[in-house]
Protein backbone atom coordinates (compact mmCIF):
# COMPACT_ATOMS: atom_id res chain seq x y z
CA UNK A 1 0.00 0.00 0.00
CA UNK A 2 2.89 2.33 0.79
CA UNK A 3 4.36 1.66 -2.64
CA UNK A 4 1.06 2.57 -4.26
CA UNK A 5 0.95 5.89 -2.42
CA UNK A 6 4.59 6.58 -3.20
CA UNK A 7 4.11 6.02 -6.92
CA UNK A 8 0.73 7.76 -7.11
CA UNK A 9 0.71 10.37 -9.91
CA UNK A 10 0.11 14.02 -9.14
CA UNK A 11 -3.57 14.86 -9.47
CA UNK A 12 -3.89 18.31 -7.88
CA UNK A 13 -1.99 21.10 -6.13
CA UNK A 14 -3.15 22.59 -2.84
CA UNK A 15 -1.65 25.96 -1.90
CA UNK A 16 -1.99 27.60 1.49
CA UNK A 17 -3.60 31.05 1.43
CA UNK A 18 -0.54 32.60 3.11
CA UNK A 19 1.69 31.17 0.37
CA UNK A 20 -0.60 32.63 -2.28
CA UNK A 21 -0.33 36.05 -0.65
CA UNK A 22 3.48 35.82 -0.50
CA UNK A 23 3.68 34.82 -4.17
CA UNK A 24 1.27 37.57 -5.25
CA UNK A 25 3.18 40.21 -3.26
CA UNK A 26 6.56 39.15 -4.63
CA UNK A 27 5.35 39.04 -8.23
CA UNK A 28 3.51 42.37 -7.94
CA UNK A 29 6.46 44.23 -6.42
CA UNK A 30 8.85 42.83 -9.05
CA UNK A 31 6.54 43.60 -11.99
CA UNK A 32 7.37 43.96 -14.89
CA UNK A 33 10.56 42.00 -14.14
CA UNK A 34 10.11 38.25 -13.87
CA UNK A 35 9.92 37.04 -10.26
CA UNK A 36 10.92 33.50 -9.28
CA UNK A 37 11.08 31.57 -6.04
CA UNK A 38 10.97 28.13 -4.47
CA UNK A 39 7.95 26.36 -2.98
CA UNK A 40 8.12 23.71 -0.26
CA UNK A 41 5.56 21.30 1.12
CA UNK A 42 4.75 17.63 0.90
CA UNK A 43 3.16 15.00 -1.31
CA UNK A 44 -0.04 13.65 0.21
CA UNK A 45 -1.02 10.63 -1.89
CA UNK A 46 -1.05 12.37 -5.27
CA UNK A 47 -1.86 15.88 -3.99
CA UNK A 48 1.00 18.37 -3.72
CA UNK A 49 0.44 20.50 -0.60
CA UNK A 50 2.40 23.76 -0.78
CA UNK A 51 2.85 25.07 2.76
CA UNK A 52 5.61 27.67 2.37
CA UNK A 53 7.60 29.61 -0.19
CA UNK A 54 10.58 31.92 -0.41
CA UNK A 55 11.94 34.05 -3.19
CA UNK A 56 15.33 33.72 -4.77
CA UNK A 57 17.87 36.48 -4.08
CA UNK A 58 17.56 39.35 -6.50
CA UNK A 59 20.49 40.14 -8.75
CA UNK A 60 21.71 43.74 -8.83
CA UNK A 61 21.68 44.97 -12.40
CA UNK A 62 23.38 48.22 -13.37
CA UNK A 63 21.32 51.00 -14.86
CA UNK A 64 23.10 50.59 -18.18
CA UNK A 65 21.73 47.09 -18.60
CA UNK A 66 18.40 46.66 -20.29
CA UNK A 67 15.20 45.40 -18.70
CA UNK A 68 15.39 42.23 -20.80
CA UNK A 69 18.76 41.38 -19.22
CA UNK A 70 17.28 41.68 -15.73
CA UNK A 71 14.32 39.51 -16.73
CA UNK A 72 16.64 36.91 -18.27
CA UNK A 73 18.71 36.70 -15.09
CA UNK A 74 15.58 36.42 -12.95
CA UNK A 75 14.09 33.76 -15.23
CA UNK A 76 17.26 31.65 -14.99
CA UNK A 77 17.49 32.03 -11.19
CA UNK A 78 15.88 28.65 -10.27
CA UNK A 79 18.69 26.67 -11.90
CA UNK A 80 21.59 28.98 -10.97
CA UNK A 81 24.24 27.27 -8.82
CA UNK A 82 24.24 30.04 -6.20
CA UNK A 83 20.46 29.84 -5.84
CA UNK A 84 20.56 26.05 -5.59
CA UNK A 85 22.90 26.39 -2.61
CA UNK A 86 20.67 29.12 -1.16
CA UNK A 87 17.59 26.92 -1.59
CA UNK A 88 19.23 23.98 0.18
CA UNK A 89 20.27 26.25 3.07
CA UNK A 90 16.74 27.66 3.41
CA UNK A 91 15.24 24.16 3.42
CA UNK A 92 17.73 23.08 6.08
CA UNK A 93 16.78 26.04 8.29
CA UNK A 94 13.08 25.34 7.81
CA UNK A 95 13.57 21.73 8.88
CA UNK A 96 15.25 22.93 12.07
CA UNK A 97 12.02 24.69 13.10
CA UNK A 98 9.83 21.69 12.20
CA UNK A 99 8.33 23.13 9.01
CA UNK A 100 7.37 21.00 6.01
CA UNK A 101 10.51 21.62 4.00
CA UNK A 102 10.43 19.22 1.08
CA UNK A 103 11.04 20.98 -2.20
CA UNK A 104 7.99 20.55 -4.43
CA UNK A 105 8.88 22.95 -7.22
CA UNK A 106 9.14 26.64 -7.96
CA UNK A 107 7.00 29.61 -8.95
CA UNK A 108 7.30 32.37 -11.50
CA UNK A 109 5.42 35.45 -12.62
CA UNK A 110 3.95 36.04 -16.05
CA UNK A 111 2.41 38.86 -18.06
CA UNK A 112 -0.66 38.20 -20.20
CA UNK A 113 0.12 34.48 -20.26
CA UNK A 114 3.58 34.99 -21.77
CA UNK A 115 5.57 32.33 -19.93
CA UNK A 116 6.06 29.48 -22.43
CA UNK A 117 9.73 29.77 -23.37
CA UNK A 118 13.01 27.90 -23.09
CA UNK A 119 13.78 29.29 -19.62
CA UNK A 120 10.53 27.87 -18.27
CA UNK A 121 11.26 24.48 -19.87
CA UNK A 122 14.84 24.36 -18.57
CA UNK A 123 13.81 25.35 -15.04
CA UNK A 124 11.04 22.77 -14.80
CA UNK A 125 13.25 20.07 -16.34
CA UNK A 126 15.94 20.92 -13.77
CA UNK A 127 13.47 20.28 -10.94
CA UNK A 128 11.58 17.39 -12.49
CA UNK A 129 14.63 15.31 -13.40
CA UNK A 130 15.62 15.29 -9.71
CA UNK A 131 12.10 14.76 -8.38
CA UNK A 132 9.25 13.74 -10.64
CA UNK A 133 6.67 15.18 -8.24
CA UNK A 134 7.57 18.83 -8.63
CA UNK A 135 5.40 21.51 -10.20
CA UNK A 136 5.70 25.06 -11.47
CA UNK A 137 3.24 27.67 -10.22
CA UNK A 138 2.58 30.52 -12.66
CA UNK A 139 1.06 33.74 -11.34
CA UNK A 140 -0.20 36.05 -14.07
CA UNK A 141 0.09 39.57 -12.67
CA UNK A 142 -1.84 41.23 -15.51
CA UNK A 143 -4.78 38.85 -15.33
CA UNK A 144 -4.90 39.08 -11.54
CA UNK A 145 -5.06 42.87 -11.71
CA UNK A 146 -8.55 42.51 -13.20
CA UNK A 147 -9.83 41.20 -9.88
CA UNK A 148 -9.64 37.40 -10.20
CA UNK A 149 -6.60 35.46 -9.00
CA UNK A 150 -4.68 33.79 -11.82
CA UNK A 151 -2.57 30.97 -10.40
CA UNK A 152 -1.89 27.86 -12.48
CA UNK A 153 0.21 24.74 -11.94
CA UNK A 154 2.14 22.90 -14.65
CA UNK A 155 4.49 19.96 -15.01
CA UNK A 156 6.24 18.51 -18.03
CA UNK A 157 4.64 15.44 -19.54
CA UNK A 158 6.59 12.13 -19.37
CA UNK A 159 6.78 12.00 -23.18
CA UNK A 160 8.32 15.46 -23.36
CA UNK A 161 10.74 14.66 -20.52
CA UNK A 162 12.01 11.66 -22.49
CA UNK A 163 12.37 13.66 -25.70
CA UNK A 164 14.11 16.56 -23.93
CA UNK A 165 16.52 14.20 -22.17
CA UNK A 166 17.51 12.62 -25.48
CA UNK A 167 17.51 16.04 -27.21
CA UNK A 168 15.61 14.54 -30.12
CA UNK A 169 13.31 17.11 -31.66
CA UNK A 170 13.72 16.23 -35.31
CA UNK A 171 10.83 15.67 -37.68
CA UNK A 172 11.35 11.91 -37.70
CA UNK A 173 11.58 11.57 -33.91
CA UNK A 174 8.47 13.70 -33.38
CA UNK A 175 6.61 11.64 -35.96
CA UNK A 176 7.60 8.38 -34.29
CA UNK A 177 6.79 9.56 -30.76
CA UNK A 178 3.63 11.42 -31.89
CA UNK A 179 4.67 14.34 -29.68
CA UNK A 180 2.86 17.62 -30.41
CA UNK A 181 2.74 21.06 -28.81
CA UNK A 182 -0.31 19.94 -26.83
CA UNK A 183 1.78 17.27 -25.07
CA UNK A 184 4.43 19.59 -23.61
CA UNK A 185 2.68 20.47 -20.35
CA UNK A 186 0.26 18.82 -18.00
CA UNK A 187 -1.88 21.40 -16.21
CA UNK A 188 -3.01 20.51 -12.70
CA UNK A 189 -5.97 21.96 -10.79
CA UNK A 190 -5.03 24.42 -8.04
CA UNK A 191 -6.94 24.68 -4.76
CA UNK A 192 -6.40 27.44 -2.19
CA UNK A 193 -6.52 26.07 1.37
CA UNK A 194 -7.20 27.98 4.58
CA UNK A 195 -6.49 26.83 8.11
CA UNK A 196 -9.39 25.74 10.31
CA UNK A 197 -8.90 28.80 12.53
CA UNK A 198 -9.13 31.18 9.59
CA UNK A 199 -12.13 29.33 8.18
CA UNK A 200 -13.92 29.64 11.52
CA UNK A 201 -13.14 33.36 11.60
CA UNK A 202 -14.52 33.84 8.08
CA UNK A 203 -17.75 32.08 9.05
CA UNK A 204 -18.14 34.43 12.03
CA UNK A 205 -18.03 37.56 9.90
CA UNK A 206 -21.57 39.00 9.73
CA UNK A 207 -23.15 38.31 6.39
CA UNK A 208 -24.87 41.15 4.51
CA UNK A 209 -28.64 41.27 4.89
CA UNK A 210 -30.59 39.29 2.36
CA UNK A 211 -32.14 41.28 -0.43
CA UNK A 212 -35.89 41.61 -0.03
CA UNK A 213 -38.68 43.87 -1.12
CA UNK A 214 -38.45 47.23 0.65
CA UNK A 215 -41.81 48.38 2.04
CA UNK A 216 -42.87 51.81 0.87
CA UNK A 217 -43.11 54.47 3.62
CA UNK A 218 -46.66 55.50 4.55
CA UNK A 219 -45.78 58.99 5.76
CA UNK A 220 -42.94 61.50 6.13
CA UNK A 221 -42.43 60.38 9.72
CA UNK A 222 -41.68 56.84 8.51
CA UNK A 223 -38.93 58.19 6.26
CA UNK A 224 -37.34 60.18 9.10
CA UNK A 225 -37.63 57.26 11.50
CA UNK A 226 -36.30 54.59 9.12
CA UNK A 227 -34.53 56.08 6.10
CA UNK A 228 -34.48 53.82 3.09
CA UNK A 229 -31.01 52.62 2.08
CA UNK A 230 -30.37 52.81 -1.61
CA UNK A 231 -29.78 49.24 -2.80
CA UNK A 232 -26.68 48.36 -4.72
CA UNK A 233 -27.29 48.51 -8.44
CA UNK A 234 -25.09 47.86 -11.47
CA UNK A 235 -23.39 50.87 -12.93
CA UNK A 236 -23.03 51.86 -16.53
CA UNK A 237 -19.44 50.60 -16.85
CA UNK A 238 -20.70 47.38 -18.44
CA UNK A 239 -22.16 49.46 -21.30
CA UNK A 240 -18.79 50.98 -22.16
CA UNK A 241 -18.02 50.16 -25.79
CA UNK A 242 -14.27 50.75 -25.60
CA UNK A 243 -12.16 47.73 -26.46
CA UNK A 244 -10.56 46.00 -23.50
CA UNK A 245 -6.86 47.03 -23.34
CA UNK A 246 -5.98 43.49 -22.26
CA UNK A 247 -7.58 42.22 -25.46
CA UNK A 248 -5.50 44.61 -27.56
CA UNK A 249 -2.28 43.61 -25.81
CA UNK A 250 -3.09 39.92 -26.15
CA UNK A 251 -3.77 40.36 -29.87
CA UNK A 252 -0.41 42.11 -30.29
CA UNK A 253 1.36 39.28 -28.47
CA UNK A 254 -0.55 36.76 -30.57
CA UNK A 255 0.66 38.40 -33.78
CA UNK A 256 4.25 38.42 -32.48
CA UNK A 257 4.04 34.71 -31.66
CA UNK A 258 2.61 33.92 -35.10
CA UNK A 259 5.45 35.88 -36.70
CA UNK A 260 7.99 33.91 -34.65
CA UNK A 261 6.26 30.71 -35.68
CA UNK A 262 6.51 31.62 -39.37
CA UNK A 263 10.18 32.53 -38.94
CA UNK A 264 10.88 29.10 -37.50
CA UNK A 265 8.83 27.53 -40.29
CA UNK A 266 10.85 29.40 -42.95
CA UNK A 267 14.09 28.19 -41.36
CA UNK A 268 12.86 24.60 -41.55
CA UNK A 269 11.80 25.05 -45.18
CA UNK A 270 15.25 26.44 -45.98
CA UNK A 271 16.77 23.32 -44.39
CA UNK A 272 14.53 21.11 -46.52
CA UNK A 273 15.61 22.91 -49.70
CA UNK A 274 19.27 22.53 -48.73
CA UNK A 275 18.75 18.84 -47.97
CA UNK A 276 16.99 18.24 -51.28
CA UNK A 277 19.80 19.99 -53.16
CA UNK A 278 22.51 17.92 -51.45
CA UNK A 279 20.59 14.68 -51.94
CA UNK A 280 20.25 15.47 -55.64
CA UNK A 281 24.02 16.00 -55.88
CA UNK A 282 24.62 12.70 -54.09
CA UNK A 283 22.27 10.89 -56.46
CA UNK A 284 24.06 12.34 -59.48
CA UNK A 285 27.45 11.38 -58.04
CA UNK A 286 26.29 7.81 -57.32
CA UNK A 287 24.89 7.42 -60.83
CA UNK A 288 28.16 8.71 -62.29
CA UNK A 289 30.22 6.39 -60.09
CA UNK A 290 28.07 3.38 -61.10
CA UNK A 291 28.64 4.22 -64.75
CA UNK A 292 32.38 4.49 -64.15
CA UNK A 293 32.45 1.15 -62.34
CA UNK A 294 30.49 -0.48 -65.15
CA UNK A 295 33.07 0.82 -67.63
CA UNK A 296 35.94 -0.34 -65.42
CA UNK A 297 34.42 -3.80 -65.05
CA UNK A 298 34.05 -3.99 -68.82
CA UNK A 299 37.74 -3.08 -69.08
CA UNK A 300 38.52 -5.74 -66.42
CA UNK A 301 39.63 -3.13 -63.89
CA UNK A 302 38.86 -3.01 -60.16
CA UNK A 303 35.76 -0.91 -59.36
CA UNK A 304 35.99 2.29 -57.36
CA UNK A 305 34.32 2.50 -53.91
CA UNK A 306 30.72 3.69 -54.11
CA UNK A 307 30.52 4.99 -50.52
CA UNK A 308 33.04 7.73 -51.10
CA UNK A 309 30.19 10.26 -51.27
CA UNK A 310 30.05 10.27 -47.46
CA UNK A 311 33.44 11.99 -47.43
CA UNK A 312 32.75 14.34 -50.32
CA UNK A 313 29.28 15.54 -49.36
CA UNK A 314 27.96 16.72 -46.01
CA UNK A 315 24.23 16.77 -45.35
CA UNK A 316 22.92 19.86 -43.51
CA UNK A 317 22.00 19.48 -39.84
CA UNK A 318 18.27 19.60 -39.20
CA UNK A 319 17.37 22.43 -36.80
CA UNK A 320 15.55 21.55 -33.60
CA UNK A 321 11.77 21.72 -33.77
CA UNK A 322 11.50 22.59 -30.07
CA UNK A 323 11.27 26.34 -30.64
CA UNK A 324 8.49 25.79 -33.15
CA UNK A 325 6.60 23.62 -30.67
CA UNK A 326 6.91 26.26 -27.96
CA UNK A 327 5.74 28.99 -30.34
CA UNK A 328 2.75 26.87 -31.33
CA UNK A 329 1.90 26.27 -27.67
CA UNK A 330 2.18 29.99 -26.95
CA UNK A 331 -0.08 30.80 -29.91
CA UNK A 332 -2.63 28.36 -28.53
CA UNK A 333 -2.36 30.06 -25.13
CA UNK A 334 -2.99 33.51 -26.60
CA UNK A 335 -5.86 32.23 -28.76
CA UNK A 336 -7.62 30.87 -25.68
CA UNK A 337 -7.16 34.21 -23.92
CA UNK A 338 -8.54 36.13 -26.90
CA UNK A 339 -11.53 33.79 -26.99
CA UNK A 340 -12.19 34.51 -23.31
CA UNK A 341 -11.75 38.28 -23.69
CA UNK A 342 -14.02 38.59 -26.74
CA UNK A 343 -17.07 37.09 -25.01
CA UNK A 344 -18.21 40.45 -23.63
CA UNK A 345 -16.87 42.50 -26.53
CA UNK A 346 -18.78 40.46 -29.11
CA UNK A 347 -22.07 40.92 -27.27
CA UNK A 348 -21.55 44.70 -27.19
CA UNK A 349 -20.66 44.83 -30.87
CA UNK A 350 -23.77 42.87 -31.85
CA UNK A 351 -25.89 45.20 -29.71
CA UNK A 352 -24.44 48.27 -31.45
CA UNK A 353 -24.82 46.67 -34.87
CA UNK A 354 -28.46 45.86 -34.15
CA UNK A 355 -29.21 49.50 -33.35
CA UNK A 356 -27.36 50.82 -36.40
CA UNK A 357 -29.14 48.62 -38.94
CA UNK A 358 -32.18 50.24 -40.60
CA UNK A 359 -35.51 48.74 -39.67
Curated annotation (Swiss-Prot):
Phylogenetic lineage: Eukaryota, Fungi, Dikarya, Ascomycota, Pezizomycotina
Name a biological process GO annotation: formation of cytoplasmic translation initiation complex
Q: Which GO terms describe its molecular function?
A: metallopeptidase activity; translation initiation factor activity
What coarse category fits the chief subcellular location reported for this protein? cytoplasm
Could you tell me the gene encoding this protein?
Answer: eif3h
State if rRNA-binding is listed as a keyword: no
Q: What family is this? A: Belongs to the eIF-3 subunit H family.
Stated name of the protein: Eukaryotic translation initiation factor 3 subunit H
GO-annotated cellular components: eukaryotic 43S preinitiation complex; eukaryotic 48S preinitiation complex; eukaryotic translation initiation factor 3 complex
